[in-house]
Amino acid sequence: MNFEPEYIYHIYNRGNNRQKIFFNHENYLFFLRKVRKELLPYMDILAYCLMPNHFHFLVQIKAKQPQSVRPLPAVRRIGEVRPVPVIARKIGTLLSSYTQAINKQQHRTGSLFQQKTKAKRLTHSTHPTAPSGQTGFDYDLACFHYIHRNPIDTGLTKKPEEWVYSSFRDYAGLRKGSLCNKELAYEILHYDKESFYEQYFVKFSAGNFTHPQCI
């Protein structure tokens, strides 16, 4: 996985053999605490959804990385966007440490997640070297909706706000979560903070939010 600064990615993985990865309420919270520790220094989280056997994150890689990140070689081509290799390692650390905790809890051994975490780079980017004419707004919006629709599409809830393990409740003003950079998401997705809930369903009704470009 290569992650480039200021680009937006859909990151997702599921349980090995589609098995459960979250067994109780505390597991979900523990995983999010791990995400905050391992990933948040390197990326802005725009949306997330944790499902019983898989997870989704919509993120934008930060332009300025922590000083602890080893600098890349100084020689580079003009306009070249350099990847941030530490992020893939941090995702590995997140999943490995979570697996160890769950294996201990469930008295099990072996892998919990599928071997390869997928990271789909969307066409939208605020980076100045992004291809001209590719705003990717529809893909970002599609992914935002796709992630929040997971509990509905799998029959767990009838409304997105009923699933407490996603960021939708934060955007809908039903919870004061701080994991997502909501202001950045409003800017990228052209949402208005005060009327998010109404705008969400207007946009949802107007488009197809399972576009293959975001998954």
Model-found features: residue ranges?
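Structural motif
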Residues: 54-56
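Short Pro-Cys-Gly-centered "Cys-loop" motif that presents a nucleophilic cysteine in a tight turn
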Residues: 1-47, 51, 61-215
